[in-house]
Amino acid sequence: MEPEPHSSEAVPTAAALFAWGANSYGQLGLGHKEDVLSAQQLSDFCKSGCIKRITGGGGHSAVVTDEGSLFVCGLNKDGQLGLGHTEEVLYFTPCKSLLGCAIQQVACGWDFTIILTENGQVLSCGSNSFGQLGVPHGPRRCVIPQAIELLREKVVSIAAGLRHALAATASGTVFQWGTGLASSGRRLCPGQTLPLFLTAKEPSTVTGLENSQAVCVLAGSDHSASLTDAGELYVWGSNKHGQLASQAAFLLLPQRIEARCFQNEKIAAVWSGWTHLVAQTVTGKVFTWGRADYGQLGRTVETREGWESEKQDPSLPGSGPQKGTPSCLPCLTGATEISCGSEHNLAVIGGVCHSWGWNEHGMCGDGTEADVWAPKPVPGLRFFLGLHVGCGAGHSLALCQLPALPALGQHPSVTSPSPDATKEARSQEAMEQERNQKERHAETSPQAQSDRFRNGGLVAETLE
């Protein structure tokens, strides 16, 4: 039987990159430097469907394609884009110095970038003021990615914090470099000798992990973390906001967070903001802990003596677990993608992109600048299928599937989010609209800024 006219298959579905949030340096890749409060689609800078990794730093962004190409944009005053110059770049641009070198992962720090190739080599570019490039006698900055020669073993994971970086090798060893944690360590541990890895400007082995095998490393503004092949999480550094789930103010050496904190389940993945962490167990449960005053944890928290009071959303009922105690967030169970910015988060749940946390520059994408206290769908993306998400310090990026181009006589189609997720998205949107109307008539007090400074949409902890 011959096919009916116009019954040919639809053109394969396409994907597009969306960006929103702080944009003072063009880090959204939209060609301008105005903050964006709602998700905006980027013009094609590569085949969007082949993007495999999205991330950002203090004021720059990086995208890695399936073919291993690296595209960058945004702030570049220290050469953190690796383009051979220090001019700002308003559109995603290929890093030509790495052409022919397949990239596996990129980690963006405040003003530097760490790059991992598919063969396990690590390169760095940008500011080296705190030894964060891993080249102890190198220049103050580097505008072209250079290999970190002291990392001779194959590396499988990298991370970049505010002023320090980490790498995990194929054998499970963790290295750290950059002096970003040293100041807090000296202040909070007077009279104690800091381990070399907290003060080194070249890769130094993190002691205390000899009996474990790391598969992933993470970095916050003033802390570090490592996930092992046994599903255990080790943390060290500053515990100012309870992000280490410890009673200590500062951990000089790695300490394992007890399994009971995660309902005795093994951890499959971990993400870190500057002062909070998010972990997902092997069964898909998601736990959050750490700083909570901008809604970073997606839940209410109790405060305790020794930690400064955390602002809470008065519209959310009751008080929840302490912020330094990992607590399960049921609405995130089964999330397929999660990313942490400095103090906001993105997640893909049931195919729908969600956001929550700090929103001063619109990085939650809800069209406002009011902090978001619980995960909710990003309005402009709620009917697209979320594929990948990535955060910078104060901006957001998401790769979403677009509707398929229909054959003649057919209606557009797209692989839709699950029905339950779509229903939840609409319900949450309606509740949020009602809540926003109430908030417009409510008086709000200014947020405390005593230990923070803000610059063009960027946020940094003041390191004393």
UniProtKB/Swiss-Prot annotation:
Which PROSITE patterns does this one have? RCC1_2, RCC1_3
RCC1 repeat ranges, renumbered to this chain: 14-66, 68-118, 119-170, 172-229, 230-282, 283-349, 350-401
Tell me the GO molecular function terms: guanyl-nucleotide exchange factor activity
Q: Where in the cell is it found?
A: Cytoplasm; Nucleus
Tree of life domain: Eukaryota
Q: Where does the protein principally reside?
A: cytoplasm
Compositional bias per record (Basic and acidic residues), positions renumbered to this chain? 301-313, 421-443
* Alphabetically ordered keywords of this record: Cytoplasm, Guanine-nucleotide releasing factor, Nucleus, Phosphoprotein, Repeat
Q: Which GO terms describe its biological process?
A: negative regulation of protein secretion
Q: Which GO terms describe its cellular component?
A: cytoplasm; nucleus
Question: Which residues are reported to carry the modification Phosphoserine?
Answer: 427
Task of the protein: Probable guanine nucleotide exchange factor (GEF), which may be involved in the secretion process.
Assembly and oligomerization = Interacts with SEC5. The interaction occurs only in the presence of magnesium or manganese and is stimulated by dCTP or GTP.
Record's protein name: Secretion-regulating guanine nucleotide exchange factor
Q: What is the lineage of its organism?
A: Eukaryota, Metazoa, Chordata, Craniata, Vertebrata
